[in-house]
Regions:
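A short glycine-rich, His/Asp/Glu-containing loop-to-beta-strand
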Residues: 6-41, 47, 105
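Short, conserved beta-strand element in jelly-roll/cupin
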Residues: 34-35, 44-61, 96
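Short, charged/polar surface micro-motifs in flexible loops or helix N-caps
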Residues: 27-29, 36-38, 55-59, 66, ...
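Double-stranded beta-helix
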Residues: 2-10, 23, 88-116
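Short acidic-glycine-tyrosine-enriched beta hairpin
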Residues: 63-80
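Short glycine-/acidic-enriched loop or helix-start segments at secondary-structure transitions
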Residues: 62-63, 71, 87, 105
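A cytosolic small-molecule/anion-sensing beta-strand core signal
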Residues: 26, 54-55, 70-71, 89
Length: 116
């Protein structure tokens, strides 16, 4: 088994808001994603949502206030909490979610997540 170089994986694609699976463990997917602009308001009824900023800055809008994340910072959105990620400039983010979790809360989007 070899290590995973996240910067190398991130260099393989340029699209935004399309998570790519880089590893899996205990029924969870470890993903990297490039983000820029505003995503959509959504929630996950059955799971928390883990965000860790690898590069840049990310704001996670919540209905009761915003969470601002810088490089090296993380935040977990509790299950059922509506949120909307925003990045003014391109940011690189690490996500960890149960395998097959839709990135918008809509089951159709789970099928669009690919592995690198």
């Amino acid at each position: 088994m070899s290590s995973v170089n996240l910067a190398e994986k991130l260099s393989l694609f340029s699209d935004h808001w399309t998570p790519k699976i880089v590893s899996s463990f205990n029924g969870h997917d470890v993903m990297v994603v490039k983000v820029k602009g505003e995503f959509t308001w959504h929630s996950h009824a059955d799971t928390d949502d883990f965000f860790m900023v690898l590069k840049g800055q990310l704001t996670i809008q919540l209905r009761d206030g915003d969470v601002h994340l810088n490089e090296g910072e993380m935040y977990v959105v509790p299950k059922g909490v509506e949120h909307c990620p925003i990045a003014k400039e391109e940011a690189h983010v690490l996500l960890i979610e149960p395998a097959g979790t839709p990135n918008t809360g809509d089951p159709e989007t789970a099928a669009t997540i690919t592995a690198l």
